[in-house]
């Protein structure tokens, strides 16, 4: 039986439609049940992720398919990134469950906001039009603003949310202004049409360059790249750790998709205009991120500056402007997400009622309290540093190879030097865990599911480091087939 054309147009967006329907259902159910049945929202959220993953795998696209009048694209890049988004959000929910429960935050609002944010990210990775990109971005951003402020009785969280909102609104305005200037030059908001017009050349070089500058500035804010990084440390530190884990993981995958769609597809012919801007952003991010992280005594702020430096590293792959470069950047952002889940997840597992395990001193002597969790954290820190045989080493190597291929050897050397600086604060945590006396002697009792997931998280960092080729091949093939 053939579906009408109008319904066929919606077929590639079935995962998004399913998530939206389930969010609406969770809202209704959560409003109807009492506080004692909040686990329903948690369970239904995991069911939503599993259902969306099933639909994505069932209709996995091997070739790009435009839908909804060219506003939406279903291609291997979007499908692969969506699957990683589902996995990331599921891990966040499992890690966060006990943390939220003991702090009175185990409510439907968190799960609804998480799924709305996921929906925004799904729209972003499948957008082939500036309007769709912006719609997905704003849905994600508004969900994150509310999520950061969810702990209403915390003045620190409220302050962080206000900073995030004000700076985010400014960045969104810059991005929208840049899009309007590109539209003024090309006469289109569709990325494919923009690419065709710019390949033929244009006499309006100055407006186009200004438009690209504003677009890149808006993208840099969403990534947390220097000098648009001011919100990152305050939001990571001020928000409850469960919210920090969400903000610091899945949205980076969507931000990568945004960057590669806009720069790698729509503005591909203008690589000479945006490459130098990305070089500056990457160098500043690696420098300031790594140097500022050394001075931090709070682990969440340290990870915030670490994120800034990692985004600088990821931009190295993007500025290469090649299939290998984009593939390396995609591999890097997926690996970064895996490491971030483990790092913040460890803070969640070690925290308990009335105690936030977010200071460096809280990790002193962890090997005596829980040798296995200390070993998992060691693997995560080694991977963030880039020490073989963990996957962080291969991710950095792939990005550096892409940069060297375009002749930017000096940039690769600078990246290696900044990585050596970053090794100090990562290995400091290892030293605290294995050579210092524990200050906290309370038993560590995470749930069995969280403990198993953390173990898998750490071992995945090691396994992907030993066998990185399959995931790298998926990334390069997804980029090559989609572009």
Swiss-Prot record:
It comes from Thiobacillus denitrificans (strain ATCC 25259 / T1). NDH-1 is composed of 14 different subunits. Subunits NuoA, H, J, K, L, M, N constitute the membrane sector of the complex. InterPro entries: NADH-Q_OxRdtase_suN/2 (IPR010096), ND/Mrp_TM (IPR001750). One of its GO terms (molecular function) is NADH:ubiquinone reductase (non-electrogenic) activity. Keywords: Cell inner membrane, Cell membrane, Membrane, NAD, Quinone, Translocase, Transmembrane, Transmembrane helix, Transport, Ubiquinone. One of its GO terms (biological process) is ATP synthesis coupled electron transport. It is found in: Cell inner membrane. GO terms for cellular component: plasma membrane. This is NADH-quinone oxidoreductase subunit N. Belongs to the complex I subunit 2 family. The chain crosses the membrane at residues 13-33, 39-57, 76-96, 110-130, 131-151, 165-185, 206-226, 240-260, 277-297, 302-322, 330-350, 373-393, 406-426, 459-479. Its EC number is 7.1.1.-. The keyword NAD applies. NCBIfam families: NDH_I_N, PRK05777.1-5. It is a multi-pass membrane protein. NDH-1 shuttles electrons from NADH, via FMN and iron-sulfur (Fe-S) centers, to quinones in the respiratory chain. The immediate electron acceptor for the enzyme in this species is believed to be ubiquinone. Couples the redox reaction to proton translocation (for every two electrons transferred, four hydrogen ions are translocated across the cytoplasmic membrane), and thus conserves the redox energy in a proton gradient. It catalyses: a quinone + NADH + 5 H(+)(in) = a quinol + NAD(+) + 4 H(+)(out).
């Amino acid at each position: 039986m053939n579906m009408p054309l109008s319904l066929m147009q919606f077929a590639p967006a079935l995962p998004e439609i399913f998530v939206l329907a389930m969010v609406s259902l969770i809202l209704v159910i959560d409003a109807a049940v009492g506080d004692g049945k909040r686990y329903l929202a948690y369970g239904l959220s995991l069911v939503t992720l599993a259902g969306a993953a099933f639909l994505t795998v069932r209709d996995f696209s091997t070739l790009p398919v435009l839908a909804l009048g060219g506003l939406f694209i279903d291609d291997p890049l979007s499908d692969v990134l969506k699957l990683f988004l589902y996995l990331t959000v599921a891990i966040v929910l499992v890690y966060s469950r006990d943390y939220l429960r003991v702090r009175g935050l185990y409510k439907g609002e968190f799960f609804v906001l998480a799924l709305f944010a996921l929906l925004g990210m799904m729209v972003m990775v499948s957008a082939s039009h500036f309007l769709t990109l912006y719609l997905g971005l704003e849905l994600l951003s508004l969900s994150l603003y509310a999520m950061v402020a969810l702990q209403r009785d915390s003045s620190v969280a409220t302050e962080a949310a206000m900073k995030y909102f004000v700076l985010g609104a400014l960045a969104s305005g810059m991005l929208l202004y840049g899009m309007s200037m590109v539209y003024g030059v090309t006469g289109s908001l569709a990325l494919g049409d923009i690419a065709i017009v710019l390949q033929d050349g244009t006499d309006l070089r100055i407006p186009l360059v200004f438009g690209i500058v504003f677009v890149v500035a808006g993208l840099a804010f969403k990534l947390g790249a220097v000098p648009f990084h001011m919100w990152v440390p305050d939001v990571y530190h001020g928000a409850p750790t469960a919210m920090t884990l969400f903000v610091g993981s899945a949205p980076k995958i969507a931000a990568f998709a945004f960057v590669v769609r806009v720069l790698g597809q729509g503005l591909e012919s203008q690589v000479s205009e945006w490459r130098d801007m990305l070089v500056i952003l990457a160098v500043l991010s690696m420098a300031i991120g790594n140097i500022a992280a050394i001075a931090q005594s709070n682990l969440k702020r340290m990870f915030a500056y670490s994120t800034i430096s990692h985004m600088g590293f990821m931009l190295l792959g993007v500025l290469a402007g090649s299939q290998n470069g984009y593939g390396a950047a995609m591999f890097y952002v997926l690996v970064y997400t895996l490491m971030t889940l483990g790092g913040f997840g460890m803070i969640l597992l070690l925290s308990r009622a009335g105690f936030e395990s977010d200071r460096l001193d809280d990790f002193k002597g962890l090997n005596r309290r829980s040798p296995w969790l200390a070993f998992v954290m060691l693997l995560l820190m080694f991977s963030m540093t880039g020490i073989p045989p963990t996957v962080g080493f291969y991710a950095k190597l792939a990005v550096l190879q892409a940069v060297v291929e375009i002749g930017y050897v000096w940039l690769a050397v600078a990246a290696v030097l900044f990585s050596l600086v970053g090794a100090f604060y990562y290995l400091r945590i290892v030293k605290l865990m294995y050579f210092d006396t524990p200050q906290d002697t309370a038993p560590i009792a995470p749930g069995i599911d969280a403990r198993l997931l953390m173990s898998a998280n750490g071992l995945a960092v090691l396994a992907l480091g030993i066998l990185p080729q399959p995931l790298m091949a998926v990334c390069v093939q997804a980029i090559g087939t989609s572009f």
